[in-house]
Swiss-Prot record:
Annotated tissue distribution: Ubiquitously expressed.
Chain ranges of zinc fingers (PHD-type): 204-256
Biased composition (Basic and acidic residues): 167-181
Similarity field: Belongs to the Alfin family.
Signal peptide: none
Name this polypeptide is given: PHD finger protein ALFIN-LIKE 5
Compositionally biased tracts (Polar residues): 148-165
Subcellular location: Nucleus
Residue ranges of the region described as Disordered: 142-203
Organism: Arabidopsis thaliana
GO MF, one annotated term: transcription corepressor activity
GO CC list: nucleus
Biological processes annotated in GO: chromatin organization; response to salt stress; response to water deprivation
Acidic residues bias: start-end ranges: 182-202
Length: 260
């Protein structure tokens, strides 16, 4: 899979960091400069595809390694399946997030394999943390951070505000069905009646894929085109992935739009 770099094994902190930067540069190249080529290679009709970055700053879209367990940690599997069900920028952001996780896993795999002690691991993480993440580069947040450079106090404040906004967005999402939380000490008759009505309505909801009834402990998502509800598992959408989707189209609607 590594193509000429399969036997390359960095053994020092500096070598591992150099390996990290090379792989990171390749992935950024795929998600920015070569984005059209990358988009075309991630055909949803193909099998589970992964985005690989190599130490020589080359990227590749390919099937996962056949050997089990693989020689190195594997990147996110099946990035091509969500391509046509999301806006392109949201899909690229999702791939970037998973790529960041993969880059860290590869670096600390080398750290564990070659016995880095606590000081080495801390130094490696500090070196990695000094460069913007792939996600920050792809979304443009890296440039904003270099311009703003907020103080640590402001960073903590912004982090709290960001978390509160995320909670607000999750509670207001129109795409997912969540079981309502019971609020202790607040028993309003009108609220209880509304909850009963919602439960009756959701109980009659059928999955557009498998035809099963709605259950409160399952994740569901609604198609913005046909307005049908689907089990997340039936359409291969997770709650984490749904957060990045602004306008979801089910597989049937996606195929209809793709036809000439």
């Amino acid at each position: 899979m590594e193509g000429g770099t399969a036997h390359y094994s960095p053994r020092t902190v500096e070598e591992v960091f150099r390996d990290f930067k090379g792989r990171r540069a390749g992935i950024i190249q795929a998600l920015t400069t070569d984005v059209e080529d990358f988009f075309q290679q991630c055909d949803p009709e193909k099998q589970n595809l992964c985005l690989y970055g190599f130490p020589n700053e080359v990227w590749e879209v390919n099937l996962p390694a056949e050997e089990v367990p693989p020689e190195l940690p594997e990147p996110a599997l099946g990035i091509n399946f969500a391509r046509d069900g999301m806006q392109e920028r949201n899909w690229l952001s999702l791939v970037a997030v998973h790529s960041d996780a993969w880059l860290l896993s590869v670096s600390f795999y080398f750290g564990s394999r070659f016995g880095f002690d606590r000081a080495d691991r801390k130094r490696l993480f500090s070196m990695i943390n000094e460069v913007p993440t792939v996600y920050e580069v792809v979304t443009g947040n890296a440039e904003k951070q270099t311009k703003e450079m907020p103080s640590s106090a402001n960073q903590n404040g912004n982090r709290s505000k960001s978390n509160s906004k995320m909670r607000g967005l999750e509670s207001k999402s129109s795409k997912t069905i969540h079981a309502k939380d019971e609020e202790e000490g607040l028993e309003l008759e009108e609220g209880e009646e509304e909850e009963d009505e919602d439960e009756d309505e959701h109980g009659e909801t059928l999955c557009g894929a498998c035809g099963d009834n709605y259950a409160s402990d399952e994740f569901w998502i609604c198609c913005d085109m046909c307005e049908k509800w689907f089990h997340g598992e039936c359409v291969k959408i997770t709650p984490a992935r749904a957060e990045h989707i602004k306008h979801y189209k089910c597989p049937t609607c996606s195929n209809k739009r793709a036809r000439p």
